């Protein structure tokens, strides 16, 4: 059985990259002062809708604010967090690796990582789902039994969501054939028979390309199937059931139910509140210039973003912005402080855990067990 690995100112990235020379100089960060005119943001690989809308937002900020933003693509969670940690990008936008980095889970439960002091700076939401070939016999999630299901390599966020959707269908990885494949190669894998389905954000360009060559269909979630939804949310608590339209394999005006969750822009806590506030202000102030740029950029709007933290705290600069918009509640403040306190507890606990292991290499399973026993 497979184990479950359970806008921004464009200038910041370029600024950071210019500081990472071969002379070993310390990369620049923005620990104080405003958002720089040049910066980078790491995100999913080309061909994904996350890359497309991140690029579209970056281009809009470049045009409207004179920023210079570089988008750095990667198909892996580590590949999207590492540039930010190493000073090659000021921001990152990806899947649940921001949660795993915060908690030091899965690929981050290793000596060179441990708990990361991550903060959320903007929280757009987006739909994700599973697509199959029409006539394949895969019409529902329970039909995945015995089928070749993608196991997105080095991408615990996607692995988690696919695990949750299998649970929705009453299945586990023991019931399917797990196929190692990168997130960005899934659509091509369906074409050549390597996998039977693809899981992605629903507006990815690779899905439109797949639709142009084959008859395809979406596997739908039923929000009224409370038991199935509960099983799914038990595995992926940051998600909810919503609907989307205007995607591949849809007629005009058709709506399809899917898995929804935030795909946030993140940074480290050390980034200045002024810089993050500048980013939030720019994203809000220029929304009309990118709202219709891609099918998912509407999810960057103020009425669509997540306004209460759940598993990772919001940055002080983002909190300041939400307060100015009368969107920051007492409930949100209480939860945010709980999460900030948890990060402090996690970093202390990580050191204690490493000492208790007496030189043994840390790993996800033993660290998770240690947390369950020693942290509330």
Language-model regions, residue ranges each:
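Bacterial N-terminal signal peptides that target proteins for export
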Residues: 1-9
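C-terminal motif of bacterial Sec signal peptides marking the signal peptidase cleavage site
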Residues: 15-19
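Bacterial signal peptide processing site
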Residues: 21-24
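Bilobed "Venus flytrap"/periplasmic-binding protein-like clamshell domains
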Residues: 36-64, 69-70, 127-192, 205, ...
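Pocket-flanking alpha-helical
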Residues: 53-60, 70-112, 130, 138, ...
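Pocket-lining segment of extracytoplasmic ligand-binding domains
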Residues: 96-98, 104-109, 136, 173-175, ...
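Ligand-binding clefts/hinges and TM-proximal coupling segments of bilobed small-molecule sensing domains
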Residues: 148-164, 239-306, 310
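An extracytoplasmic/periplasmic, membrane-proximal ligand-sensing/linker region
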Residues: 202-218, 231, 284-376
